[in-house]
Amino acid sequence: MAELRQVPGGRETPQGELRPEVVEDEVPRSPVAEEPGGGGSSSSEAKLSPREEEELDPRIQEELEHLNQASEEINQVELQLDEARTTYRRILQESARKLNTQGSHLGSCIEKARPYYEARRLAKEAQQETQKAALRYERAVSMHNAAREMVFVAEQGVMADKNRLDPTWQEMLNHATCKVNEAEEERLRGEREHQRVTRLCQQAEARVQALQKTLRRAIGKSRPYFELKAQFSQILEEHKAKVTELEQQVAQAKTRYSVALRNLEQISEQIHARRRGGLPPHPLGPRRSSPVGAEAGPEDMEDGDSGIEGAEGAGLEEGSSLGPGPAPDTDTLSLLSLRTVASDLQKCDSVEHLRGLSDHVSLDGQELGTRSGGRRGSDGGARGGRHQRSVSL
C-alpha cells in the first residue's frame, strides 16, 4: 500500500506520485502585501485632498524654484571661490620663492635701489590722484555753469510780467540761486584739492629724478628683480580682484536664498492664518436636560414646567387617584403634587426618596399594588366626583 505523505498544499499524496508545482501567479495576493518598491509608487506619492489642492498657493512653487536656484548658485560660486583662493595662494608662494632666489643672486644692489622704486610708486599714485582731482574740478565747474544758466532763466521769467510777481518763478529763482552757491563751493573745493595733489605729484617727480641721478648704477643692476616683482604684483592684483568679485556673488546668492526662505515662511504663516480663520465653528448639538441630582437652570425650569403641564393634560385619560379633596381643588392639588415630584427628581439622586410618594403617583404608569388599589377603590366609592389621574414620568 502506498504510503501517504502530507504536502504543504493540504492534500495527501501517495509516495512516488509527484504533486504539480503551484504556479506562483495563481496564488492570490493580498493587496496590502504587494511589492512596496515597484508597485507602490502611487501609494508613496502623497495625494492632496481637494481642499489642500485648492489652498495650494502658486507662490510656493515659485519661491521653491528661487530657493533651488540660489542654492545651486551658492554651491557653484563657492567652489569657484575656493579654486580662486587656492590659485592666489599658490601664485603668492611661487612669486615669493622666485623673488628670494633673484634677490640672493643680485645682492645688496636691491636694497640700494629700493628707495628709487618706492619713490616711483608714490609718484605714480600722486599722478592718479591728480587726474581724479582734475575730473572732480571739471564736474564742479560744469555744475556751476548749469546753475548760473538756471538763475538767468528764472530771472527772465520773474521779469516777464512787471505788474505781477509769479510765486512759481520766484521759487525757481531761489532754488537756482541755492544751486549756484553750492556749485561755487564745490568748484572752489575741487580747485584747492587739485592744486594740493598737483604739488604732491611735482614733489614726487622731483624726488624720483634726484634718486635716479644718485643711484644710477644700483638701479641698473637691480632692474630684473623689480621688473619681476612688478609682474607678480599685477598677476596677484588680478587674482585678488577675481576673489573679491566671487565673494560678492556668494553674498548676493546667500541674500537671495534668505529672501526666498523668508517669503516661504510668510506664505506658510498666511496659509495657517487663513485656515484657522476659515474653520467653521463647532456645531451646537441638541440641548441635553440636566441629569438627576443636578440643579436646573432657569431654562430647564421652564422646560420642566411645560412638561409637567403637558403631563397633567395627558393624565386625564388614565386612572389614578391623587388624593381626597373637593372637585374644584383637585386640579390645583394635582399640579402642586406633580411639581413637588419634579423638584424631588431634580434634587435627589436616590430612588428611595420616591417610595413615600407611591400613595399618590405611579412612576411607571402601572398599578402600584393591592393596598394602593384598595385605597383608591374605597376613596373612589366615597367620592364619586373625583377625577382619576395617572402620571407617567
Curated annotation (Swiss-Prot):
It holds the Pfam family SH3BP5. Residues 317-332 have a biased composition (Low complexity). Residues 18-28 have a biased composition (Basic and acidic residues). Residues 384-393 have a biased composition (Basic residues). Residues 59-140, 169-272 form a coiled coil. GO terms for cellular component: cytoplasm. The modification Phosphoserine is found at residues 30, 49, 343, 350, 358, 362, 378. GO terms for biological process: intracellular signal transduction. Residues 1-58, 273-332, 362-393 are annotated as: Disordered. The modification Phosphothreonine is found at residue 13. Residues 297-306 have a biased composition (Acidic residues). The keyword Heme does not apply. Keywords: Coiled coil, Guanine-nucleotide releasing factor, Phosphoprotein. The keyword Thylakoid does not apply. One of its GO terms (molecular function) is guanyl-nucleotide exchange factor activity. Belongs to the SH3BP5 family. Functions as a guanine nucleotide exchange factor (GEF) for RAB11A. This is SH3 domain-binding protein 5-like. It comes from Homo sapiens (Human). The gene is SH3BP5L.
